[in-house]
A protein has these predicted regions:
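Single conserved hydrophobic/aromatic residue that forms the stacking wall/gate
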Residues: 1-13
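Conserved phosphate- and dinucleotide-binding cores of soluble alpha/beta proteins
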Residues: 9, 15, 27-32
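Acidic, His- and aromatic-enriched active-site or binding-groove loops in soluble protein domains
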Residues: 16-20
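A conserved mid-domain beta-alpha-beta active-site/ligand-binding segment of alpha/beta enzyme cores
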Residues: 23
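Asparagine-biased alpha-helical interface segments
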Residues: 29-148
Length: 148
């Protein structure tokens, strides 16, 4: 199923629809009609499903924070990045990893961060991290270790 999703199978499309509609529909037309916080929570639920299926001890999470745009990486025509690269982050805890990346954006000296912060705040982006933490998927606390 994981391999099939990588090549754009019907199963992958159905699963994306369920995430975007908070499992309230199987119709593509309904993808962007769900309550936004419910959509963010469904992303955390999907993460939990993968973690439970694969096994938490078998996953390492990596975030490559480069060419940071205000748009989702799933957008076919994203806005040009306004913020420079802030690094590559890795952890066995997906919640602390995402929290570290969010904090890195806020703490950056890059003046281009303003647009990204506005987008994260106006879309309540931190809610996925909050929901994942509430599901017990990890901790929002972390120790940042810089390498190199």
């Amino acid at each position: 199923e994981i391999c099939a999703c990588l090549v754009g199978s019907e199963m992958c499309i159905r699963d994306r629809i369920w995430i975007h509609t908070s499992a309230s529909s199987e119709r593509f037309e309904d993808v962007f009609t769900a309550d936004h916080d419910s959509f963010l929570e469904s992303m955390a639920d999907a993460d939990k499903s993968v973690m439970d299926f694969v096994g938490r001890s078998r996953i390492v999470y990596i975030n490559v924070a480069n060419r940071l745009s205000v748009d989702c990486d799933c957008d076919a025509h994203p806005h040009d990045p306004e913020m420079g690269d802030i690094g590559i982050f890795a952890s066995t805890d997906p919640v602390s990893l995402d929290q570290a990346c969010v904090d890195a954006v806020y703490n950056s000296l890059d003046t281009g961060k303003a647009a990204l912060i506005e987008r994260m705040e106006s879309r309540h982006g931190i809610h996925t991290v909050e929901a994942a933490h509430a599901l017990g998927l990890g901790s929002r606390d972390y120790d940042l270790v810089k390498i190199g």
